[in-house]
Amino acid sequence: MAAINIRLSKNFTTQLNKLNEKYGEEFARLNGLSDGELSYTDFIDNFVDTETVADASIDSSSNVSTKHMNTLLNEMPKPHRKLLCLHKIYYEINKKYGFKTANEWLEKEWTRALYMHDADTATFKHYCFAYDLKDLAEKGLFFLENFGYEPAQHYTTFIDFVKEYISFAANLSSGAVGLPNLIPYMFYFWKKDCDEHYLGITEEYFEKYARQGVQRFVFAVNQPYVRDGIQSAFTNVSIFDGEYLEALFGGAEFPDGTFMVDYLDEIKEFQKLFMEEEAKIRNTNMFTFPVYSLSLLRKNGRFVDEEFAEWGIKQICIVNKINEKNQISGWYDSNFFIDDSVTSLSNCCRLKSNIDDLGYFNSIGGTALKVGSVKVSTINLARLALEHPKDEKGYLVALRDTVELDCKALDIVRNIIKRDVEKGLLPNFSKGLVDFEHLYNTIGFIGIYETMKTFGYVEVDDFGNSFYTEKADAFGKKIFQVIHNAKESFALDKDYKINCEQIPGESAAAKLKRADEMLFEDTVVKDLPLYGNQFIPLGIKTSLQERIRIASLFDSYCNGGSICHINIDAPFDSFEKAWDMVNYIADQGLTYFAFNAKISSCKHNHSFYGNTCPVCGLPKSREWSRIVGYYTATDTWSADRKDEYEMREWENVNG
């Protein structure tokens, strides 16, 4: 049978052939574009033979945990889609910025000096967004074609509408679906049903009715077919203290014209109910989503809403028996976002949005929580260190040029997505769920630790703990200043903003490290099997104080998001210890962090700590931990991530 050809531009084909010849088959495989991956028959054979989907995919995610025919059909065309996306970006860069720039970008992308995330959908879908559910609450399923929509009238109907909304949004994007105002609207519809005694509901049943709605939501978003028929939707839910609630929703109205501000205390209590019920569910089913962010305002060394802060820390960090079935709370399943201003919030995985920056506040308090990213393209900082060892000036000049090139690539991707919208191919935009006004272009980075190690700016004490030197602190600030200056200069004549993110790098971290091993075998930092997605990677031994210090030092530069994960070998054994730890971290100026635990599950998927299930008595069969930003079973991780997990350091917080 004749070969099946894909029509691509001559310039792109010529350049790709040159890169193949220059860098060899290993780099083609690293890009997911080797002959074996582009061959459907070879891909099928490899898919069947590998242990996990993550090891077979060219763009792995531990959220895709089950090998079945739908997974195969979804993963198989990824290499071809990626090829088409790279071609389109190259073609458009060539048109706008010139042939030399297009070739430079493609070579850096090919050699993993740059890394376009979700590359197989880079020219088809945007990345992530935090959605405002106001239109859904007031109109119903307004985004569906040929569908006579009307607003929900009841609690259960609204939750079902949210499920459809998430599915619609998730399948037309490649990243997280943030839901900052989900709970206020759930409260509204629940209260409406209670006030009207819907279906004869009496007061003693009100709480149970509320909890059933939470169950309905949590089970739905964790079904493994919501996105692309192969995985659950990456959903984020925001939990706010009283100060955040008032600032964000003080001027908002519910569908019946009542003001949210009149119900803030009740909404706060509904948030508690939501998290308490989700914790109860986790006992019988170890679920991944939603990922929570608990937003707390802190001024002058204390939490402004101290009662809510105390409740949140107890709920997240303290293992408490909640019923006679030996079920517990305290799953460490929420990120902490602690700031001295309500103009920022965290959603969409690591995305930190400055509400003032994008004009989210209106004169009566503001409710437009919409914020997201068109796409993320990451700079391999470790590569620059290998190319310019111990030459700060050379490093920073090369970094400036790389940032500018990255901005050009992201600019092209943004314009391609815009044209997709104009062609009517992205109804999530045309129906108003997402808009470009609230979408950043995001520059990612990885490899800060490896940069400092290459420059000799990391010291190790007699106990084996690694510390950044004063030179590392100063050089790190210079790196981020160059990134910000370069991106701000590029954006001067643009109608959008560019932000900066320390990427999770679930699969990118290993690919970038592998590329550097092939190009710089003798000088690459070999401390870990992949590059760290923390300022001091979780597999590097250091003191807790140093980990927090460095994260706090660099955190403010990451307006696109950064989170410090603090691995703990066992849950806090007292509230006082957890309270003191959270306050200590906040006092160091670290705004976004999470405690990361090891959670066990038995064959019935009951969750617990230790080796024996307290619910059914069966032994531990799986272990769960944050692979990057969310809990998944470690046996679904790629081989590189499993190796990294074995090297992670765990803090004793009870000593």
Model-derived features: positions:
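Short, surface-exposed acidic
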Residues: 460-463, 634-636
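Metallocofactor- and cofactor-centric catalytic cores in central/energy metabolism, strongly enriched
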Residues: 208-219, 453-454, 632, 641, ...
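Contiguous, well-ordered alpha-helical segments that form the cores/surfaces of helical PPI scaffolds
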Residues: 184, 441-454, 626
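Core of folded catalytic or high-affinity ligand/protein-binding domains
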Residues: 436-445, 642
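Conserved catalytic cores of very large enzyme subunits
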Residues: 3-437, 458, 464-469, 473-614, ...
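Glycine-centered flexibility sites
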Residues: 444-447, 560, 629, 640
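Long, charge-rich boundary regions
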Residues: 617-655
